[in-house]
């Protein structure tokens, strides 16, 4: 990737809520082409959201403004970083688009296709750029894409992605007693913030397909050259965690994909518990071409670290040479400059949302379902 012009004035960025993970605005702040200007959210939000927003603002020594319209009207900025609860992603991004601001937004784009379409219409109407956060610049994904683009394994025929996170999500399934109330989804997500396993934070319960499915589906979208998933067949289950079971969402799923150009694909995804794997989880690509095949571990390159009195829950394996977040920020800057296109734009992320929704419908119906692509 060519670098952006470091001589240009940095873009000023407003942070529209940072109540889930803060990796997105941190990555933007770490890039020399961006400066964070403020954090903002609506004053009507619950207290826990204000506490998280204020904490981030204090760390970066920028103001926290409890009024989005006021923040946008009184501060001259070029772009926004959007990282609230997933159910609010599109609401905040539409406000930014209508203000003529470029957008980098956390995943998933939304849990509703109508919200995705509303955002896309606003982006196209106001001619702004939108990058949806992803992991497509991991070293292993770059290597996999190079193997396909170079025709080293011939024409791409089929690919599979294992995407298992070996993380806990509260009490294990079967641990509740007969008179116990169902676990409240939001309460559980608030508890999970300390260890970063609250990707599904919000009022609406979200299964692993909705929370993390964008990652493997974005891999597949990139590796197939942007081909659309046309039809899916899926199985989903609450297999590991009581909170998922109580809220009728999946923590384990398999999806078979029929993709444009006669390509077949599949993915297996789950939040499978910390005891299930010595590393963060089994995340692997299996790619079959007309002249050969390859298996690529998403975590590589990595090193293993062991030392005396090491905390038992500390991951022993550490990824190295991982510039994914920096390269995403670089891609965003180049896209604003008009020198590049987002590696995952809002239409592609919307179609991934459509694939997830079709998969959930397929699991409910027990039959293949067509994907409603845009």
Task: Please report, for each region that a protein language model flagged, where it lies by residue.
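N-terminal Rossmann-like dinucleotide-binding module
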Residues: 1-59
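C-terminal helix-rich "cap/oligomerization" subdomain common to oxidoreductases
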Residues: 1-7, 79-81, 117, 333-374
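Contiguous beta-strand/loop segments that form the cofactor/metal-binding neighborhood of enzyme cores
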Residues: 6-7, 211-300, 327-338
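Predominantly a Rossmann-like dinucleotide-binding segment in NAD(P)-dependent oxidoreductases
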Residues: 19, 138-245, 366
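C-terminal glycine/acidic-rich active-site capping loop/insertion
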Residues: 31, 62, 186-190, 275-277, ...
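Beta-loop-alpha module in the N-terminal Rossmann-like domain of NAD(P)-dependent dehydrogenases
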Residues: 60-122
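Hydrophobic residues in well-ordered beta-strands that form the structural core
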Residues: 66, 105, 130-132, 160, ...
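Rossmann-fold dehydrogenase core element
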Residues: 118-135, 155-159
